[in-house]
Amino acid sequence: MNTNTLLIENKKAKFNYFIEEKISCGIVLKGTEVKSIKAKKLSFNNSFAIIKKEELWLENLHVSKYKEGNIFNHDELRPRKLLIKKKELQRLKKFKEKEGYTLIPISFYLKKSIIKVEVGICKGKKLYDKREILKQKSIKKDLSREIKYK
């Protein structure tokens, strides 16, 4: 039985980056942030993970304010600490030292009742890579249509 429930996925990450590896980690959140994320009120635009002082931080993740929240509502763009084992952090450092690699949040999911983040070690795609993928998708669609109508 799979206990992981996908909350939200970063679809642009798969289009803009080659995902080399995925790492699951916890995230430090406030109460109203948890409720907003469970309501799928977050945006991945320009978000990334960065290593500061032997810790992994998620930057530029926009979590909307909780509608029923009061004066204790959270700051929408605050940096959020990611919880990860030291061995995995060392491995991430090695990838970050290489040219062109970045850490991008791929998805948020529930494991039992705890919110987890899947962070991908990604390398940016060039424009011609994206065009090639779009061509392959359109060819695949055309073939499936032809097969369907024959």
From Swiss-Prot:
Entry annotated with the keyword Cytoplasm: yes
GO cellular component, one term: cytosol
InterPro entries registered for this protein in UniProt: SmpB, SsrA-bd_prot, SsrA-bd_prot_CS
Superkingdom of origin: Bacteria
Disulfide bridge partners, by residue number: none
GO BP, sorted A to Z: trans-translation
Record key words, sorted: Cytoplasm, RNA-binding
Subcellular location(s) per record: Cytoplasm
Keyword Transferase carried by entry: no
Molecular function terms from GO: RNA binding
PANTHER family, A to Z: SSRA-BINDING PROTEIN, TMRNA-BINDING COMPONENT OF TRANS-TRANSLATION TAGGING COMPLEX
Similarity comment: family membership: Belongs to the SmpB family.
Functional note: Required for rescue of stalled ribosomes mediated by trans-translation. Binds to transfer-messenger RNA (tmRNA), required for stable association of tmRNA with ribosomes. tmRNA and SmpB together mimic tRNA shape, replacing the anticodon stem-loop with SmpB. tmRNA is encoded by the ssrA gene; the 2 termini fold to resemble tRNA(Ala) and it encodes a 'tag peptide', a short internal open reading frame. During trans-translation Ala-aminoacylated tmRNA acts like a tRNA, entering the A-site of stalled ribosomes, displacing the stalled mRNA.
HAMAP family in the cross-refs: SmpB (MF_00023)
NCBIfam families, per the entry: PRK05422.1, smpB
Protein name according to UniProt: SsrA-binding protein
Organism: Borreliella afzelii (strain PKo)
Gene coding for it: smpB
